[in-house]
Amino acid sequence: YELIYSHPELMIDWFPVLGNHEYRGNTQAVLDYTSISRRWTMPARYYTKAFEDKGTTIRIVWIDTAPMMDKYRNDSATYPDACKQDLQKQLSWIDSVLTSAKEDWIIVAGHHPIYAETSKDDSERLDMQKRLDPILRKHKVDMYICGHIHNFQHIRRPGSDIDYIVNSAGSLARKVKPTEGTVFCNPEPGFSVVSADKKELTL
């Protein structure tokens, strides 16, 4: 991380989330890296922060998605920390944060997608749709950003105003094709930039 993302303009705060690869190892070490790297800003497994610029406010809620899926919780040999997490506590926290959020824009970010075109196990997304998506829809979240699939997908689902974004990969990009609700998809590696004013959230 430090060697790859070494450009001077990248010497800014980074706000990570835990993913499936972190859950294969020592997840606490990922949090502890906050005390070693000035850029690495991860105060907890899930956390939130509000930003303001030129009168526009954004709240970002970073969440821990691996414990939301039975696949990880039921495989303690491979993902030893997943079953130890209090899932209901996190879901209640997300609901509480979104209930009190008053910012112009609300973005939730986690590792795993709620909707995506992928060859990965369908149960992952079904668990996310069952446990997380109803909370996001209830609070009319503007955007859910994730990774995991190693390509870019922008999805809008019927009955929801949420923009579901699968962010592209920094490496190991995978092929992708449209699925239900696809607005745009692309297999190229890269990064996304989000900007906002009072009227528009732009990706």
Features from the language model and the residues they span:
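C-terminal structured domain segments across diverse proteins
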Residues: 112-115, 149, 171
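Aromatic-lined ligand-binding clefts that engage carbohydrates, nucleic acids, or primary amines
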Residues: 109
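Extended active-site neighborhood of metal-dependent phosphoesterases/phosphodiesterases
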Residues: 1-106, 120-127, 131-143, 151-197, ...
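Short beta-strand and adjacent tight-turn residues that come in two discontinuous sequence segments
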Residues: 146
